[in-house]
């Protein structure tokens, strides 16, 4: 989480917290799913000899560490928040239920959803889709280091061009790596639009909420 590509960067974390605060003050109800790849990835761990289930469980724990770090950063800038975990681990976080999350967001809390889905073999993307559908979100914002969806990986192909909007059907037909297949199909089936944008540019989150077209909308 930061410039070094691993571990937790307090400066980057502070940037995220301030951006989230800005949007929260607009009256937007916010639920956040955070990954754990800066600490451990279950799939890559299994390729190095770890049991896949154990590896994924380690990855879930990594998301909890990141969630606690983000919670602390949000608290430092005055944003009330709750960490909700897919696996029981009180008092580190509250055990997630849809109703608990919705109630907290209606009370003005930013909810941070951690530990993925609570089950192995599911990615952070799938966990994000699941939580977005469960809490009946209007849109899922996918903050990445790229400013949208391209015809190819722009970090590898300089001729890649960006989409302002694209349908789920076209994403699947082109085999674009917006999210994993399970996550894409879940969003498509439940009519949850995704907006992909570069979260690492300070101020971009508010621009998205203000309606500026700085990323790519994926929709039915």
Region locations from a protein language model:
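C-terminal catalytic "cap/lid" subdomain
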Residues: 1-220
